Amino acid sequence: MSMQRSDSGSVHSSALLPEEFRANDFLLSHLDIACTIHSNLWDEPLLAINSGGLFSTASRSRCYCTNLRGHKPITSYASCVSVKPVQEFLGWPSDRPWPAWASTAWFDNCLRAIVGLSCASPRSVTQIKQYIKANPGTRLHKPSEKDVLKKIRVYNLVPSRTGTTPDVLSVEKVEELMGFSRGHTGSCDQYHTTDHQRRKMLGDSFQVDTVAYLLTPILDLQRAGKLPPEGITVLSLFDGIGGALVALHKIGVRLNRVITCEKDELRRMVVRNWMQKHAPRAIHIEMVDIRDASKGPSSTAFIRNIMNKGPIHLVIGGSPCQNISMLNRVSSDKGSGRSGFSGDDSHLFFSYVTILRKCKEEHERRGRRGGTG
């Protein structure tokens, strides 16, 4: 199976044994973008899911395209996931009144999950704190308060435990929102991460519990003996901080070999640390640049080399999508602007597609030969 995801939020996934495919795109901004993804990923239909209220206290809308079959009804599965209301998630004392401004800001009981863009400047936070302190009963309904309300939501400002003025949601709480364990992106012996780096990494990642739901058929196949009970082989492209691997681990899918591709060294170390703790027996191979494995004859050699040691059961990843994101305000004339799949980063989607097709071709070739693939 393979899947792809990106910073602006695209995910595409497809399983090779058996044939299973899934894709997610973040807030499809243009129909032509949706059609490009759809046509390159075997014309599978798109499925829209908002994680908020179903899998997380965070609102995170995505569209998915999958050929995985056999999911439980989403409401039935989600009913088994404990999603806390905002006040409970924050640990707000039940005997203290909830601030009026917070009732307006978080009226839908869902915090924001675009945390990569929500690193508020100290000056902005101070200004908002001063305004709320001077207007303690405000519900932020006045036209003049529209900018304050917007910043509170964008920056994920929540009532502080020691008072009613806003404070920035802690990184540990953001990790929980995104479905990771506390400290997943934290520093360890091998590396040090700053608050800003952790927020950026989390903002670029999957909402783990949502992806876990979409991957549940993999567990069913493993339990039924259709996938190796000792563990599957996963090729994770644009791996980030390992959201897909964490999702598989959460639902109980065992891992045997994991090949990850991620250009950022800090994110690779986060995944390395997680693998050592949670999948110490799995073979972990790291790649840096997907282009090294997706161009010319070397791409076929790369896939064959992996499959010589056993079939690839899941290909999963997330190419950068800032060039197709509605949040991108840079001119389309610039490589970093909203220029579609011709942009500096989003064109890597096609590298993902190339590798996925090579995997399928090699699997089919080995099947015709009666091989192990």
Predicted regions and their residues:
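Conserved active-site and SAM-binding loop architecture
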Residues: M1-G373
